[in-house]
Each structure stands twice: as C-alpha cells, then as structure tokens.
Amino acid sequence: IGGIDLYKSLNAGNSWEKVNDWWEYYGDPSTYLHADIPAVQFLKNNNGTEMIYVSTDGGLYDSNNQLHSVENLSLDGLGVSQYYSTYTKREDPYQIFAGSQDQGFQRSTDHTNSIYDFEQVVSGDYGHLSSGDDGVSIWSVYPGFAMYYPDASSNISGITWDFEMSGALWLPPLMEDPYDPSSVYLAGGGLSGGHHILKLTRNGNSIQVDEGDYGFNNTITAMAY
C-alpha cells in the first residue's frame, strides 16, 4: 500500500510493516524509498524471480526479496525528472542546470558523451533558475526559501534566505539583476503584507533583502525587462 510511505503485508493484510520512513531517503538515497508512492508493480524476470517495482516522486526502485531491501534505479543515467526550470551556460563548456520536482537542483557538467548525465546536488522542488553572469552563479527558489550558488558547477550547498513574507506563489518567480550577478529580483509577497518586488543580494554567507516601495494589487506571477 502506497501513500507518503510504502507498507507491505506478508500475511494477507492481517498486519502491515512500513518499508522505511520517507526521511531516511536523505541518509542513503540508494537503498531507501523516496516519499510519495503513486504506483507499485509486480513482475517476474526471465529467471522466474518475482520483482517489485516501486514508483516514487524521487525515482524508480526495484526489489527481488519482497521489499526486505530496495535499490534505487534512478541515481545513474536514468532520466526520470520533471523539470520546473533549466539554465544552460552560454559559452563552452555549456553546462546545464535544472530545477526539478522532488529530485532537486541538478547539473550536467561532463559532456564527453552524447548522452548527458545529471548529478542531483540536493533533493526537493527547485524552480525559476536565474543567472546574471551566464551561468557561473545560479539563483533558484524552493517552497519556503531562495537559494544562491556562487559557483554553480561545483558548490555542494547554497546560501539561502527563508521566506519572511506572505502573499507569494508556491514557487515565486525570479529575475536576474543585469548589473550585479550576486543580486536577483523575487516576486512577492511582502515582508509586511501586500505584493512587492523584493531584491535579494548575497552578503557573505547570508542574503540581504530589500523590498520595493511600489505595492501591486495582486500576486506577482511573472517579471521581465
């Protein structure tokens, strides 16, 4: 039975056992199921072994031992992500960055083969990737914070600002600052209500926030210049 977690029964449903807690995925994505289970399928392989395939919001898993253990098939080479946003560097080496649904911020930096593999840097939902320096640094949003990678091709963790505003979208749009790549404009929301454009600027290992004076009548859904 699938929900947020997956449960199994080996006695015709008289008792149930949770395969793993959703949060255990972050300790070892290769052997723990990701949260949210939309489908489970039983199949036999060519040797007659019953295989169980589990679809999750973080990829596809299989098990050959009645879910005593699972293996993540999506960590290497299998493209199963749903992308909210992508950004491609405009000059060689043409690295690609992506914000995905539940499979986090990803990047593809090795293009020696015709098929590009992507590395998942962090899990979660990321969108509206933006850069003011042609992809050297990347801004992104998550439901609850904005994040900045000063060196997007190598940084493991980003600098974040938790949303201290109301009235914004679930993934509020971003727009790069054409003069300062360490700054970005975010569609609010407002720090004290209303709907304003916020300017986020990296300040060391933190992010400074300045709210525009003009108040819009409704939620801001898009920005461009």
Task: Specify the residue positions occupied by each region the protein language model found.
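Beta-propeller blade termini and top-face loops
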Residues: 1-225
